[in-house]
Regions:
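PRPP-associated nucleotide enzymes
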Residues: 1-221
Length: 221
């Protein structure tokens, strides 16, 4: 996104974090914490990968995690949630479900919209979703590593005339190192070491890297 002199940046607000062991156990119970050699969607390599889809496939776990994340934003007035596909879809829906109804609610609850990648790989707002200029949006993601998808989503919203007032994720694996232009809160702080490919010790050992992220997924012809 375009940065301007004097822009204010935020890093993960740990004062809102709940003790994360209870939520981390949910991931471990579902077998969602994987160990091996992974190439992340950011291009970085890591020996640990959290596959949120494995825990979010269970509706009760998804509801619990979504409610926990939504609770971190109880001090904000939120009109709608927006997430990047695919990783943020389910958690965005569950966070929206747990949020209190907005003043404009017509009975359906807080809307959960999403952006998705077009043929060029850029995130876009499609499927008839529209953003009113005064709509207060919360960007929700599953995992932050570099924050790239979240920053891209914020840019899409701003270009469409919307206003992002905060962003959240189930897991912040960055160690709180990401600069966001809005307040940011994560349910679980789980710093995991990542490497650029040229410095990856697993590559030096000759271990092949697996690409587990949804950005690498392609539909069968």
């Amino acid at each position: 996104m375009m940065l301007q002199p004097g822009d204010r940046f935020f890093r993960t607000d740990r004062s809102h974090m709940q003790p994360h062991q209870e939520f981390l156990r949910v991931f471990e119970t579902a077998g969602a914490v994987r160990h091996g050699h992974f190439e992340l969607s950011s291009g970085l390599h890591s020996g640990t990968y959290v596959q949120c889809a494995l825990v979010l496939q269970y509706p009760r776990y998804a509801e619990k995690l979504g409610a926990g994340l939504a609770a971190l934003f109880s001090d904000m007035s939120i009109d709608a949630v927006i997430s990047p596909a695919l990783g943020g879809l389910i958690v965005g829906q569950e966070v929206a479900r747990a949020l209190p109804p907005a003043k404009s609610d017509t009975g359906g609850g807080t809307p959960a919209m999403f952006v998705e990648r077009d043929a060029s790989g850029a995130l876009t707002l499609r499927r008839g979703f529209s953003l009113a200029p005064d709509l207060r949006l919360l960007v929700i993601e599953d995992v932050w590593t570099t924050g790239g998808s979240t920053l891209e989503t914020i840019q899409v919203v701003e270009e469409a005339g919307g206003r992002v007032i905060g962003t959240g994720a189930l897991i912040d694996r960055s160690g709180g190192s990401i600069d966001f232009p809005v307040p940011c809160r994560a349910l679980i702080d789980l710093p995991i070491v990542s490497y650029i490919p040229e410095e990856c010790p697993l590559c030096r050992e000759g271990r092949p890297a697996v690409k587990p992220g949804s950005r690498f997924t392609r539909s069968a012809p």
